[in-house]
Swiss-Prot record:
One term under GO cellular component: cytoplasm
Positions of the RNase III domain: 5-136
Gene source species: Roseiflexus castenholzii (strain DSM 13941 / HLO8)
Domain DRBM, residue spans: 163-232
Family under the similarity heading: Belongs to the ribonuclease III family.
Region (Disordered): 189-234
Record key words, sorted: Cytoplasm, Endonuclease, Hydrolase, Magnesium, Metal-binding, mRNA processing, Nuclease, RNA-binding, rRNA processing, rRNA-binding, tRNA processing
Protein's recorded name: Ribonuclease 3
Active site: residue positions: D53, E125
PANTHER family on file: RIBONUCLEASE 3 (PTHR11207:SF0), RIBONUCLEASE III (PTHR11207)
Cofactor: Mg(2+)
């Protein structure tokens, strides 16, 4: 552990009744693979991440539903997606320096995993679940809603990130009655800085390809390319 949990609790402004929950939230599964002697006393954060994902989605959904009372489903979905995307949750994790506190295997450590957006987002969701189990939903609201509110304010100034996947899906469903799918073509680059190449398809027809530092980003880029080729990007 790089830093004491008391420091992290101060950053989070949360006092845990059962600090073992926070330990679990910060324990990546790779750490247990190298610490056979500690497996009886530690569990990975995967179960907490599962619960935290649902809580984050619920609170984001509730917030945008209440904030935009006249908005339709598509508009609400776009706002929620912006709040819960990997990059947004990873930025929250960086704010609390969760990467420095995460328990990782040596191999993951050397690959730069502490700052990997997907790992940071997963860890943040696990911490949310730990707060929920220890303190209840009101404590999670107190912790999470200010982060969401700040993000909403920024997005209202700068505009929503364009969701090309939703745009492509709406068009393909309307024109062809099917849902586009995405297939990974290549994964390249070092472990700590990968680049993914994805293809967007309608049935077996290739619509476009895209690259990105995460699978989600590559899929968005593939959808953008597909819309460009179809002549449908705004």
């Amino acid at each position: 552990m790089k830093k004491p949990l008391d420091e992290l609790c101060a950053r989070l402004d949360v006092t845990f009744s059962d600090q073992r929950l926070l330990w679990q939230a910060l324990t990546h599964r790779s750490f247990l693979n190298e610490r056979v002697d500690e497996r009886l006393s530690l569990f990975s954060n995967e179960r907490l991440e599962f619960l935290g994902d649902a809580i984050v989605n619920f609170l984001a959904t509730t917030l945008v539903f209440e904030r935009f009372p006249d908005a339709g489903e598509g508009y609400l979905t776009a706002w929620r997606a912006a709040l819960i995307r990997t990059e947004t949750l990873a930025s929250f994790a960086r704010r609390y320096d969760l990467g420095s506190h995460t328990l990782l295997a040596r191999g993951e450590e050397s690959s730069g995993a502490r700052q990997r957006p997907s790992l940071l987002a997963d860890t943040f969701e696990a911490v949310v679940a730990a707060i929920f189990i220890d303190q209840g939903l009101d404590a999670v609201r107190k912790f999470l809603l200010p982060l969401f509110e700040e993000t909403l304010a920024t997005l209202q100034e700068q505009g929503l990130p364009v969701d090309y996947k939703s745009k492509l899906q709406a068009r393909i469903q309307a024109e062809r009655g099917i849902t586009p799918r995405y297939r990974m073509i290549e994964r390249s680059g070092p472990e700590h800085q990968p680049e993914f190449t994805f293809e967007a398809l309608a049935g077996d027809e290739s619509l476009g390809t895209g690259r990105g530092a995460s699978k989600q980003a590559a899929e968005q880029d593939a959808a953008r390319d597909a819309l460009d080729r179809l002549g449908g990007r705004d």
